[in-house]
C-alpha cells in the first residue's frame, strides 16, 4: 500500500512543476484541431466536457472551435484558476466553465454530453476504468477523444518495460487499448 504522505508530496511537486505551463502533458493545438476536424458531425451547440483538463489548453480550444460551452473538470484548484484567467484573457469566460471535481466520480445524468475530451488524464483512473465510467455520460451519437499511453512495439527495451510495469502496470499496446474501448461500449473510429 502506498504511503499517503508520499503521494500527497508527489502530487504537490507535480502541480508545482506544471504550474504556469500551457499544458500538463503531451500534445499541441495543431494536433488537437486536426483531430477535431476529423470527428463526426456534432449538434450545433454540442455539450462538451474536458475531463482532467489541467490548465485548460483543450477546453479553450474546444470553446473556440465549437463556439459552445465547455465543462472543464479537474481536481486541482491551481490549474482551474489558471484556466479561468486564460478564458477571461481570450474572451471565453462565458463558454469555459471550470469545475473542481473528480473526473472518475461525475454524477451527471446519462447522455449529458455530446463530446468527451481527455488528454493525458485517463491513466489517473486507468484507461479501461475511465472509459467505463465516462461511457454512460455520452449521448447515443456522442464522441469521446481520449489519449492513452501505449506501447508501439512488442520489442521495447527492458529498461522502459521495467519502468512502466512499475509506474503504470496496465499500460498496453494499441490493439489491446482498442479492445478495452470496445469492451467499455465504444465504437473505435480511429487512433493516432
Where are these regions (language model features)?
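Conserved alpha-helix/loop element of class I SAM-dependent methyltransferases that forms part
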Residues: 25-44
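Class I SAM-dependent methyltransferase Rossmann-like catalytic core
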Residues: 14-26
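Class I SAM-dependent methyltransferase SAM/SAH-binding core
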Residues: 49, 55-105
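Substrate-binding/catalytic lobe of Class I Rossmann-like enzymes that use SAM or dcSAM, i.e.
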Residues: 166-192
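Short, glycine-/aromatic-enriched active-site segment of Class I SAM-dependent methyltransferases
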Residues: 149-168
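A short glycine-rich, Lys/Arg-flanked "PGG" loop and its adjoining helix->strand segment in the class I
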Residues: 129-143
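A short acidic, Gly/Pro-enriched loop at the edge of an enzyme's catalytic core
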Residues: 105-115
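A short SAM/SAH-binding and catalytic strip from SAM-dependent methyltransferases
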Residues: 115-128
Amino acid at each position: 500500500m502506498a504511503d499517503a504522505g508520499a503521494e500527497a508530496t508527489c502530487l504537490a511537486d507535480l502541480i508545482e512543476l506544471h504550474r504556469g505551463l500551457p499544458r500538463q502533458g503531451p500534445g499541441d493545438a495543431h494536433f488537437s484541431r486536426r483531430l477535431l476536424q476529423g470527428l463526426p458531425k456534432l449538434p450545433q451547440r454540442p455539450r462538451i466536457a474536458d475531463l482532467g483538463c489541467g490548465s485548460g489548453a483543450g477546453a479553450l480550444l474546444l470553446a473556440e472551435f465549437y463556439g459552445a460551452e465547455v465543462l472543464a473538470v479537474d481536481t486541482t484548484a491551481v490549474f482551474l484558476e489558471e484556466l479561468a484567467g486564460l478564458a477571461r484573457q481570450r474572451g471565453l469566460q462565458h463558454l469555459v466553465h471550470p469545475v473542481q471535481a473528480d473526473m472518475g466520480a461525475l454524477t451527471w445524468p446519462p447522455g449529458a454530453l455530446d463530446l468527451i475530451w481527455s488528454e493525458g488524464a485517463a491513466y489517473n483512473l486507468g484507461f479501461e476504468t475511465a472509459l467505463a465510467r465516462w461511457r454512460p455520460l455520452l449521448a447515443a451519437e456522442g464522441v469521446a477523444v481520449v489519449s492513452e499511453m501505449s506501447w508501439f512495439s512488442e520489442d521495447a527495451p527492458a529498461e522502459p518495460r521495467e519502468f512502466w510495469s512499475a509506474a503504470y502496470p496496465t499500460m498496453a499496446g494499441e490493439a489491446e487499448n482498442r479492445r478495452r474501448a470496445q469492451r467499455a461500449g465504444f465504437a473505435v473510429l480511429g487512433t493516432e
